[in-house]
Amino acid sequence: MNHNVIIVIALIIVVISMLAMLIRVVLGPSLADRVVALDAIGLQLMAVIALFSILLNIKYMIVVIMMIGILAFLGTAVFSKFMDKGKVIEHDQNHTD
């Protein structure tokens, strides 16, 4: 079996998985479920880009993959802080600078 066929099959599987996560984003039930589903979609998007870069032999796409990973991590970290404290940026009223 040609390796291109295997990559295309993997792409189809990942895209189907992304559609399932998109349903979770729309239906919920909670905000935390939606954020976790969005994070999973980010990881799956990284996999799709990696598979396309292998299929098309494009080596510089690793930079795009890393940027998506960083943005997904920051989004999850910001949301977890929001869930914990109710706000993202805290202003210290006692700070005298």
From Swiss-Prot:
Activity: how regulated: Na(+) extrusion is completely inhibited by the H(+) conductor carbonyl cyanide m-chlorophenylhydrazone (CCCP).
Ranges that cross the membrane: 5-27, 34-56, 60-82
Pfam family name, one: MrpF_PhaF
Cellular component GO terms, alphabetical: plasma membrane
Compartments, record wording: Cell membrane
Location, primary (coarse class): membrane
Molecular function terms from GO: sodium:proton antiporter activity
Family annotation (InterPro entries): MrpF/PhaF-like
Keyword annotations from UniProtKB, A to Z: Antiport, Cell membrane, Hydrogen ion transport, Ion transport, Membrane, Sodium, Sodium transport, Transmembrane, Transmembrane helix, Transport
Membrane topology category: Multi-pass membrane protein
Protein family according to the UniProt entry: Belongs to the CPA3 antiporters (TC 2.A.63) subunit F family.
Role according to the record: Mnh complex is a Na(+)Li(+)/H(+) antiporter involved in Na(+) and/or Li(+) excretion. Na(+)/H(+) antiport consumes a transmembrane electrical potential, and is thus inferred to be electrogenic. Does not transport K(+), Ca(2+) or Mg(2+).
Subunit structure of this chain's protein: May form a heterooligomeric complex that consists of seven subunits: mnhA1, mnhB1, mnhC1, mnhD1, mnhE1, mnhF1 and mnhG1.
NCBIfam families found in the cross-reference section: PRK12600.1
Protein name stated in the entry: Na(+)/H(+) antiporter subunit F1
Organism: Staphylococcus aureus
